[in-house]
Regions:
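Negatively charged, low-complexity tracts enriched in Asp/Glu with abundant Ser/Thr
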Residues: 7-62
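Conserved aromatic-histidine-acidic binding/catalytic patches
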Residues: 30-33, 64, 98-101, 105
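A recognition module on extended beta-rich or small alphabeta surfaces enriched in W/G with H and D/E
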Residues: 95-125
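Amphipathic, interaction-prone secondary-structure segments
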Residues: 52-80
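Intrinsically disordered, low-complexity regulatory segments enriched in Ser/Thr/Pro
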Residues: 77-105
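Short, surface-exposed, charge-dense and proline/glycine-enriched linear segments
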Residues: 32-39, 85-96, 118-124
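Short, highly charged C-terminal tails/helix-capping segments
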Residues: 124-137
Length: 137
């Protein structure tokens, strides 16, 4: 099921332009993004974090959603890099209760789940030479 019609917003849109937590999340995702090129089974990854695969229709290679609080969903959106453009891992949020969450809490959930996803990458690629970040979680 796609997410057309759902309002997807960034942490910056929740907290405002000067969001320190958006910078924290961006930095954490940039350091971990390369590892997600090793994901072979997106459905398996979604199950591993208790989420689901969702097509957002925004040019992503894959995206997962996870309800982190009643009425609050986080979307992990991955685009593989190529010769012309670097890959990216982004996070968006939606839900009727998004405004009751603090940016600090949302950032913490994001980093927690991204680290958990790195464990999946490590466990499902035992013989691969993975990025160092996979071995630090």
């Amino acid at each position: 099921m796609g997410s057309i019609g759902k309002k997807l917003i960034s942490l910056r849109e929740i907290e405002g332009v000067a969001s320190p937590h958006q910078r924290q999340v961006d930095s954490a995702l940039a350091a971990r993004q390369k590892a997600f090129e090793y994901v072979k089974d997106v459905v398996g990854l979604a199950k591993y974090i208790g989420g689901k695969v969702e097509s957002l229709g925004i040019g992503e290679d894959w995206s997962l959603s996870k309800e982190i609080f009643p009425g609050v969903r986080v979307y992990f959106v991955f685009v593989k890099g190529d010769e012309e453009f670097p890959g990216s891992l982004k996070v968006l949020f939606s839900g009727k209760n998004i405004n009751v969450m603090k940016g600090e809490d949302l950032a913490g959930f994001v980093i927690l789940y991204v680290n958990h996803m790195l464990r999946y990458v490590r466990e499902t690629n035992p013989d691969a030479n993975l990025p160092e970040v996979c071995y630090r979680v």
